[in-house]
Amino acid sequence: MQVKDQLSLLQPYKPGKSPEQMKEVYGDHSFVKLASNENSFGCSPRVLDELQKSWLDHALYPDGGATTLRQTIANKLHVQMEQVLCGSGLDEVIQIISRAVLKAGDNIVTAGATFPQYRHHAIIEGCEVKEVALNNGVYDLDEISSVVDNNTKIVWICNPNNPTGTYVNDRKLTQFIEGISENTLIVIDEAYYEYVTAKDFPETLPLLEKHKNILVLRTFSKAYGLASFRVGYAVGHEELIEKLNVVRLPFNVSSLAQKAATIAFGDDEFIEEIVRVNTEGLRQYESFCKENEIPFYQSQTNFIFLPVENGGEIYEACAHAGFIIRPFPNGVRITVGTREQNEGVISVLQQHFENKKRKSRDEANV
């Protein structure tokens, strides 16, 4: 069967292993999943309460336009409903954007170490992918600007960045946007927006009034704790959103997902508490790393990245202790959990790095 030639360059997305899959390899004991940046504390209790009380006619299609959810988002963000596009997670929103905008001969520009779906969908559409190395874990907007050309249709900026957790500040982002042609779409993926505590983090929505070529992406999968419902959204200029809706599949967000997201979006107290406990969890890891001279990136998300060698060894050590983290060629990414879970992972890290120091000393004395 003939398919696009470029599909041979790609692999299906491989999520982190589930606890059930881990048991097959590491034995039948409990596992804590800290690999995919889900909310370790779950979702708003209001969501669970309201869904139990609600009745949905499961024989009927959902509202194809997600009208109530989009209006709820628009009201809170002070934009028009027509500026909001909802998708089955940001994965689908990224696919919609790529399918609507890109064609063979175009290129996209993004970072070399960032969310891989930007690259994935560009290749599917037959586009060149220009990847710029991070600068100390942060998007290098100066370098990105220098490689943008007349064929660049999309610049993808993950802010805060996944997997490093770092961010581009307001001044740098605004300066970058001012220097990019309005013919190039700038997509700012703010999946971890709710976790941010930095004072100079950009407020991007006001930029939409001046720049028609900006799209801001956010999700209910992270801080809102609704990853299994698959709801993400884009906010942009009304004319652009209208065109993207042509590509969007009909009935792409289920009735249950729309209702859960609408309820969750109204519980500000829950988000405030989540940010508080998440910040405490980050401080646990940061304190440990500083005390033991272990490199880490200052995070504005619900995970921390340690740029260290032998990430696979750390993954194995954590797995044998019942913790699932995400290894990378140049480090490990660890989702913030409960205080007790963080302490458990830190204990494994402590033992791992002590063993490495001991081994280095022994080799030096040989």
From Swiss-Prot:
Broadest EC class assigned to this enzyme: transferase
InterPro entries, sorted: Aminotrans_II_pyridoxalP_BS, Aminotransferase_I/II_large, HisP_aminotrans, HistidinolP_aminotransfase, PyrdxlP-dep_Trfase, PyrdxlP-dep_Trfase_major, PyrdxlP-dep_Trfase_small
Annotated positions of the N6-(pyridoxal phosphate)lysine modification: 222
Region annotation (Disordered) ranges: 1-21
Listed SUPFAM superfamilies: PLP-dependent transferases (SSF53383)
GO BP term, example: L-histidine biosynthetic process
Known EC number: 2.6.1.9
Pfam families cross-referenced by the UniProt entry: Aminotran_1_2 (PF00155)
Pathway annotation: Amino-acid biosynthesis; L-histidine biosynthesis; L-histidine from 5-phospho-alpha-D-ribose 1-diphosphate: step 7/9
Catalytically driven reaction(s): L-histidinol phosphate + 2-oxoglutarate = 3-(imidazol-4-yl)-2-oxopropyl phosphate + L-glutamate
Cofactor(s) in the UniProt record: pyridoxal 5'-phosphate
Transmembrane spans: none
Keywords: Amino-acid biosynthesis, Aminotransferase, Histidine biosynthesis, Pyridoxal phosphate, Transferase
Subunit-structure text: Homodimer.
PANTHER family (UniProt xref): HISTIDINOL-PHOSPHATE AMINOTRANSFERASE, HISTIDINOL-PHOSPHATE AMINOTRANSFERASE 2
Protein name (Swiss-Prot/TrEMBL): Histidinol-phosphate aminotransferase 2
Organism of this sequence: Bacillus cereus (strain ZK / E33L)
Name of the gene encoding the protein in the UniProt record: hisC2
